[in-house]
């Protein structure tokens, strides 16, 4: 606070997540993490739970630690995929991937990188994003439908439509798709299941977002009532966007 920072407006609280967000006009925004991934991201959380063991000492500043280029690249891809697979992430992510490959691609141990990406289940995502980024930023001419495959066109449209921090529609649809067992069109049953999970979140959800309720599960029914009465009013605009996304999906 002495440096002019305040807790991000929409939270008005801290120590309630895996990171605290601080803002300072006109543009500064810092996220101070206590852990790199929520526990709901099982694979990523397990990988980076003890991140210090993956860091190496800096050659110039003895008290500073950092990733190797390979581990840095893998972490950035994992972080990008976390957003991509939930609410989405903007085209800036493709620019980041392209620049990293320009600067680091020629010296990285790709056998190690690919092994790490496969272990995290994001090998295909990295390859497809890297190839798309190369077509967008690696040539002087603007890309056309002629040199983008149908899959690449769809992927680009998803990136372009995600704004900077993703959209509620993407988040809602991606969550419903994860609930759809056969990977097909989202059914009425899946929509109902999703709505129930949003109105009555389970104990595992509370582990990340309501730790006190997770610790004392007897509070869960009271939490549901409070969530509907308080959050339902405060965040009614978001709830409306979710409902509209559910209705549009056929």
Give the positions of each predicted feature.
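Conserved NTP-donor binding/palm subdomain of two-metal-ion nucleotidyltransferases/polymerases, i.e.
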Residues: 2-250
């Amino acid at each position: 606070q002495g440096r002019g920072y305040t807790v991000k407006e929409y939270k008005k609280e801290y120590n309630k997540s895996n990171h605290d967000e601080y803002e300072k006009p006109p543009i500064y925004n810092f996220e101070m993490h206590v852990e790199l991934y929520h526990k709901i991201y099982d694979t990523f959380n397990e990988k980076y739970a003890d991140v210090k063991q993956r860091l190496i000492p800096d050659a110039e500043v003895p008290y500073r630690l950092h990733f190797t280029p390979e581990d840095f690249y893998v972490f950035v891809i994992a972080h990008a995929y976390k957003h991509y697979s939930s609410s989405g992430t903007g085209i800036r992510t493709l620019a980041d991937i392209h620049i990293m490959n320009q600067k680091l691609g020629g010296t990285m141990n790709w056998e190690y990188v690919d092994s790490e990406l496969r272990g995290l289940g994001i090998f295909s995502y990295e390859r497809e994003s890297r190839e798309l980024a190369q077509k967008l930023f690696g040539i002087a001419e603007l890309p056309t439908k002629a040199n983008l495959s149908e899959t690449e066109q769809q992927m680009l449209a998803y990136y372009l439509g995600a704004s900077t921090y993703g959209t509620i529609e993407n988040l809602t649809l991606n969550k419903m798709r994860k609930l759809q067992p056969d990977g097909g069109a989202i059914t009425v049953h899946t929509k109902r299941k999703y709505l129930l999970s949003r109105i009555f979140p389970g104990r595992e959800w509370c582990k990340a977002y309501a730790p006190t309720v997770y610790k004392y599960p007897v509070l869960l029914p009271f939490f549901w009532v409070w969530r509907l009465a308080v959050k339902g009013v405060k965040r009614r605009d978001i709830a409306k966007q979710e409902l509209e996304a559910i209705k549009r999906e056929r």
